[in-house]
Amino acid sequence: MKIGPPYLTKYERARIIGVRAFQLSIGAPPLVDPERAGSRNPLDIARYEVDNGILPVSIYRYLPGGGGQSLSLSRLVELAREILGSEYV
């Protein structure tokens, strides 16, 4: 990882959860059983999918001078758990 922290920033996390919750609210199928997420609420399901790295999403981080780096959500969640341990939620 060359750009940014080895975990999702609060802005990246909020954006992904918001977009996914919107998708779920207009009828997209959840990638997990809602019972595993503990709720049928689209926001709770979206949080569960993001926090467990289930979504097939890539984050693209830009450099000020141009260029950037693409990182998968599952890899960022994995790195965050290695670094932050139980503090990562």
Swiss-Prot record:
Q: Give the enzyme's main class according to its UniProt record, as a single word.
A: transferase
Please write the reaction equations for the catalytic activity of this protein: RNA(n) + a ribonucleoside 5'-triphosphate = RNA(n+1) + diphosphate
Example of a GO biological process term: tRNA transcription by RNA polymerase III
A GO molecular function assigned to this protein is: DNA-directed RNA polymerase activity
Residues of the signal peptide: none
Q: What does the record give as EC number?
A: 2.7.7.6
Keyword entries, A-Z: Cytoplasm, DNA-directed RNA polymerase, Nucleotidyltransferase, Transcription, Transferase
Q: What is its main location?
A: cytoplasm
Provide an example Pfam family for this protein: RNA_pol_Rpb6
Q: Carries keyword Manganese?
A: no
User: Where found?
Assistant: Cytoplasm
What Gene3D superfamilies is this protein classified in?
3.90.940.10
Keyword Transferase listed: yes
Q: Which GO terms describe its cellular component?
A: cytoplasm; DNA-directed RNA polymerase complex
Q: Which PANTHER family match?
A: DNA-DIRECTED RNA POLYMERASE SUBUNIT K (PTHR47227), DNA-DIRECTED RNA POLYMERASES I, II, AND III SUBUNIT RPABC2 (PTHR47227:SF5)
HAMAP family, per the entry: RNApol_arch_Rpo6
Query: Quaternary structure per UniProt?
Result: Part of the RNA polymerase complex.
Q: Which family does it belong to?
A: Belongs to the archaeal Rpo6/eukaryotic RPB6 RNA polymerase subunit family.
Role noted for this protein: DNA-dependent RNA polymerase (RNAP) catalyzes the transcription of DNA into RNA using the four ribonucleoside triphosphates as substrates.
Q: Could you tell me what this protein is called?
A: DNA-directed RNA polymerase subunit Rpo6
Organism of provenance: Aeropyrum pernix (strain ATCC 700893 / DSM 11879 / JCM 9820 / NBRC 100138 / K1)
